[in-house]
Amino acid sequence: MPRQLFVTTALPYANGNFHIGHIMEYIQADIWVRYQRMMGNAVHFVCADDCHGAPIMIAAEKVGKTPQQFVADIASGRKPYLDGFHIGFDNWHSTDGAENHELAQAIYRDLKAAGLISTRVIAQFFDTEKNMFLPDRFIKGECPKCGAKDQYGDNCEECGAVYSPTELKNPYSALSGVTPVLRDSEHYFFKLSDPRCVEFLEQWTTDTNPRGQSRLQAEVYNKIKEWLLPDAEGKRDLGDWDISRDAPYFGIEIPDAPGKYFYVWLDAPIGYLAALKNRFIKLAGDATTGAQHYDDFMADPATEQYHFIGKDIITFHTLFWPAMLHFSGRKTPNAVFVHGFLTVNSEKMSKSRGTGLDPLKYLSLGMNPEWLRYYLATKLTARNEDVEFSPEDFMARVNSDLVGKYINIASRAAGFIAKRFGGQLGVISDDGAALLKQIQIERTSIEQLYEAREFAKALRETMLLADRVNEYVDANKPWELAKQTGMETRLHDVCTVCIEAFRALTAYLKPVLPLLAAQVEVFLNIEPLSFASVSQTLGAVHRIGDYKHLMQRVDIKQLEALFEAQAPVEPDNIATESVAPGGEGMAPVISMDDFSKIDLRIAKIVNCETVSGSTKLLRLTLDVGETNTRNVFSGIASSYQPEQLIGKLTVMVANLAPRKMKFGISDGMVLAASHADEKAQPGIYILEPFAGAQPGMRVH
């Protein structure tokens, strides 16, 4: 009987474009969904933008937009990525949609009715410069568990720990750089420490789902069991979860609690349900009928629910989320599938650090999206291991395996079928039938590997089968048979076997290469392939279409362009005058040893005043993290009023010998930029580091 599945990927935060890590996760889930549909199962594949939280509110304010406008603009840019890489979500929604507001408040009420919501006054970090309570993501410091520096206020990207912002060591505001102060605020908590929650999670995390499969990968359970197992004193790390934030906040207001909003991590996973409900409403054409269909679907014991996520958000999805669902009377996930990070040459992909492979650049260079789908699939397993992208390996796998082994089968046979036999397939001899039988026998194994998300193994088995087909071609040499008198029947037989084998291999590759498979279906003049169709043959009366080249090889120049930091600027044909950047030529090259002699430090301008007798200079009092402040003169009076600079961070040369000037001693030099021709482009601009830098930090 066909299965009915509800499949999601992690919701991307709506503060920027997709990076390649998003695309990898979507491709992984998309392959699994396509496999399920080829098996005859019904799947609802949904996702949404994660729209709430102070970071989006603050980002929107900076660009003069409402949060709603800001996230709408982000959402409008999703389609080129999804379409470009053939990712077939059935619905893309928003956590700010009406369905999410309704579901979040309903789940909260159910948890409250179950006695699992409490309130208490907590000390919360407050930014005295910005006059606001700081969201977790705008507090940084050292992880209280592993000591990693520059970690966010709610969880550690290094060890995965989840904690309260007040547990951070050496905290600072990411908005202003100041050390925040503690102020009291009443907060709402989900009582995860309740014995009922602990007992449920101990069972759920070790249990099997109705299909007899583990809900969590072994390595994932080994990670989260640290929260559940008592220590020598009988204490657990699993504490109550703070689910509220204070206004101003862009989010969903907590019922009967004016000025209090749900923490974004409470309503974000509920966005999975909201996206599904919104899909049913769209399918039904009206809200009432669609809502009923959603309720019926989720109440059906046969419905299976699966989440694909990255290993950095395990805790939210394997502890908080199932407990919220269970104690609000809702279905819990059948399984949570966790993958690792994508790395390039062993370096972690990170949007915040500005590193990685740009998906849109990949597409704009004319690179085939199915190259990337195939390559990532050859790396993806059921474990949450990191996926390594090597440009050299990428080119070798596509050119050698995909084109050289698989595509080559059709190209070696289709021409003879068309020219010598009018496009009609022939009768298959015993040796050809034996080869096709070998391919058919592997069907169950390959199906099981796709089901288990062992895509790398499924493709490895498929390419081993392609090797056997190519060995058959090399042994029979159709190009020589075509030259020999009386060998027409054998030529027809061999080429027919190749086409039949190519068709079966295409079925095995279809979840990974959907567009190519569709082109093959047209070329072979067949109905859409399923795994069941592998067990059949087309027969001697079947006619195929004309062969057209199905896939190009990767060009090394494309890969080189993909990983260039900046595309080279092509010179115009018309001669132009060479213009030096900033109005002056670059200085002579120096060695790293020379540069390392300069000690650049972050400095805070604690005071600034004009200099009597000078129209150019300002006197800056700088905090460089030392016991005493420094006095520095800077020729920036034409661009700044003293009060504009007080409290700002800048960069200074800290080891410059003190210089005696007419107005006093200048103990260092602050860095500022200006054009060489002040008359043509007036203005001098002091350098200011990003939020998070602290006085005394060295600039490397």
From Swiss-Prot:
Q: What is its main location?
A: cytoplasm
Instruction: Using the record's annotation, list all stretches that form the tRNA-binding domain.
Output: 594-700
Q: Where in the cell is it found?
A: Cytoplasm
What keywords sit in the KW lines? Aminoacyl-tRNA synthetase, ATP-binding, Cytoplasm, Ligase, Metal-binding, Nucleotide-binding, Protein biosynthesis, RNA-binding, tRNA-binding, Zinc
* Catalysed conversion reaction: tRNA(Met) + L-methionine + ATP = L-methionyl-tRNA(Met) + AMP + diphosphate
GO biological-process terms attached to the record? methionyl-tRNA aminoacylation
Is Zinc set as a keyword in this record? yes
Provide the binding site for Zn(2+): 143, 146, 156, 159
CDD domains named in the record: Anticodon_Ia_Met, tRNA_bind_EcMetRS_like
SUPFAM superfamilies attached here? Anticodon-binding domain of a subclass of class I aminoacyl-tRNA synthetases, Methionyl-tRNA synthetase (MetRS), Zn-domain, Nucleic acid-binding proteins, Nucleotidylyl transferase
Residues in coiled coil: none
Q: Motif 'KMSKS' region: residue span?
A: 348-352
Presence of keyword Nucleotide-binding: yes
| TM ranges | none
Binding locations of ATP: 351
- Record's cofactor remark: Binds 1 zinc ion per subunit.
Cofactor(s) named in the record: Zn(2+)
From the record, which residues define motif 'HIGH' region? 12-22
Give one GO term, molecular function aspect. tRNA binding
EC assignment:
6.1.1.10
Cellular component (GO) terms are:
cytosol
Subunit structure as annotated in this protein's UniProt entry: Homodimer.
The entry sums up its family as follows: Belongs to the class-I aminoacyl-tRNA synthetase family. MetG type 1 subfamily.
Job description of the protein = Is required not only for elongation of protein synthesis but also for the initiation of all mRNA translation through initiator tRNA(fMet) aminoacylation.
Protein name from the UniProt record:
Methionine--tRNA ligase
Q: In which organism is this protein found? A: Albidiferax ferrireducens (strain ATCC BAA-621 / DSM 15236 / T118)
Tell me the gene name.
metG
